[in-house]
Amino acid sequence: MAARCVRLARRSLPALALSFRPSPRLLCTATKQKNNGQNLEEDLGHCEPKTDPSSADKTLLEEKVKLEEQLKETMEKYKRALADTENLRQRSQKLVEEAKLYGIQGFCKDLLEVADILEKATQSVPKEEVSNNNPHLKSLYEGLVMTEVQIQKVFTKHGLLRLDPIGAKFDPYEHEALFHTPVEGKEPGTVALVSKVGYKLHGRTLRPALVGVVKDA
């Protein structure tokens, strides 16, 4: 029985070998597919964009230059803004200081009228009448003089200075000429007479002195 089975197996082997032999058509198809795949990869490789190193460097350099220009422009704007801010701060500070210094000039002008009245009052009193023989007039005169001195001290304390330019060179910024007259022995262009004293507040003319100016004969 076993010998019979062996003989049958030997007879079947050639047929089985033929059945498992690959078909030439299938082999050809597989080869074509493989070749097509390789060709496709090659085509895709050819389609990939190629980057020129020199072109990339040029682009980066242009971007660098552009960014540097933008940075420079921004810094210039920043510096100008800082300068404008500093100028504004200084102007504001100056305005505040001037307001402190000259904010009282309206009040000072009103007080000048009082000082003028006191000065005229003391000048109107005859000096020969001020004696012990007239104690009431003497006391009144001395009170006026003390008041005038005190008010001038207050003026000086607050930066208000008296301008009495007799004999000084005429200054159009501090003096106002009422007339011109020749005066013997006086230099032309100098102040010969002060009709009304002037005042300056912290170096700024608050009221010009009213004067008569010497002219050539």
Swiss-Prot record:
One GO BP annotation is: protein folding
Which compartments does it reside in?
Mitochondrion matrix
The question of whether Transit peptide is a record keyword is answered with yes
**Tissue specificity note:** Ubiquitous. Particularly abundant in heart, kidney and liver.
Q: Name one GO cellular component term.
A: mitochondrial matrix
Q: What exactly does this protein do?
A: Essential component of the PAM complex, a complex required for the translocation of transit peptide-containing proteins from the inner membrane into the mitochondrial matrix in an ATP-dependent manner. Seems to control the nucleotide-dependent binding of mitochondrial HSP70 to substrate proteins.
What is the name of this protein? GrpE protein homolog 1, mitochondrial
Originating organism:
Rattus norvegicus (Rat)
